[in-house]
Swiss-Prot record:
SUPFAM superfamilies: Ribulose-phoshate binding barrel. This is Orotidine 5'-phosphate decarboxylase. Pathway: Pyrimidine metabolism; UMP biosynthesis via de novo pathway; UMP from orotate: step 2/2. Catalyzes the decarboxylation of orotidine 5'-monophosphate (OMP) to uridine 5'-monophosphate (UMP). It catalyses: orotidine 5'-phosphate + H(+) = UMP + CO2. Keywords: Decarboxylase, Lyase, Pyrimidine biosynthesis.
């Protein structure tokens, strides 16, 4: 899918995650995000189980370590056949470049397409106070995000994870072909939960987002499949 809605499978066990996915018709193939909790609980087999159902996987482990360690880990991830994976832009140019090398090498060894490498800029839970006081980064959140996007582009990443509020600034700075995948998306009727920088699907589409990550408004809906379809309609229109 060119502009996917990525369902965040924020479940503690494989059984619950797969039971959720089994509510979707067999001919409705979606993209799902497997994050730290589910991957650490279930291991790589959860990726295979999701793919066996025809769904694409965004493996969101947010790697951030020394370059050699990240390259080795990404070599393993590259063999899994996932569509997207993540690394922290704060790790710097050498680490980001090592991540890309690892992904490409792993995918080539397995004979699969290399995942898109997405760099985490600032989490959508980061506000101005956290940026300035906790991280000791002076300036605005937007300036920090754009800086990390430029770094990611120069380091052969395929895109970034960012708030929809910053997508236009990123595309202006580094080009519209650089992916801006955006969490912090909530339908107008939903609460923002622990997200600080949120936007509706329709507003994110107008802002130029290349994909949306949505969890609770779908996974905790009374009718998840209908919730997904409703959000897809809003996003597509």
């Amino acid at each position: 899918m060119k502009r996917p809605i990525i369902i965040a499978l924020d479940f503690p066990t494989a059984e619950r995650a797969l039971a959720f996915l089994d509510q979707f018709p067999a001919d409705l193939h979606v993209t799902v995000k497997i994050g730290m909790e589910l991957f650490y609980a279930a291991g790589p087999s959860i990726v295979t189980d999701v793919q066996a159902r025809g769904h694409a996987v965004f493996l969101d482990l947010k790697l951030h370590d020394i370059p050699n360690t990240v390259e080795s880990a990404m070599r393993v991830i590259g063999r899994l056949g996932v569509t997207y994976t993540t690394v922290h832009a704060a790790g710097g140019h050498v680490m980001l470049s090592a991540a890309k090398r690892g992904l490409v090498a792993g995918a080539m060894a397995a004979g699969v397409t290399a995942p898109k490498l997405l760099a985490i800029t600032q989490l959508t839970s980061t506000n101005q106070a956290i940026l300035n006081q906790d991280q000791q980064i002076m300036g605005t959140v937007r300036a920090s995000v754009v800086h990390y996007a430029k770094l990611a582009r120069a380091s052969d990443c395929d895109g970034v994870i960012c708030s929809a509020q910053e997508v236009q600034a990123i595309h202006t700075a580094v080009g519209a072909d650089f992916l801006g995948i955006t969490p912090g998306i909530r339908p107008a009727s939903a609460q923002s939960d622990d997200q600080q920088r949120v936007m509706t699907p329709a507003a994110a589409a107008k802002a130029g987002s290349n994909g949306l990550v949505i969890g609770r408004p779908i996974t905790q809906a009374a009718e998840p499949v209908q919730a997904y379809r409703d959000i897809m309609t809003e996003w597509s229109n």
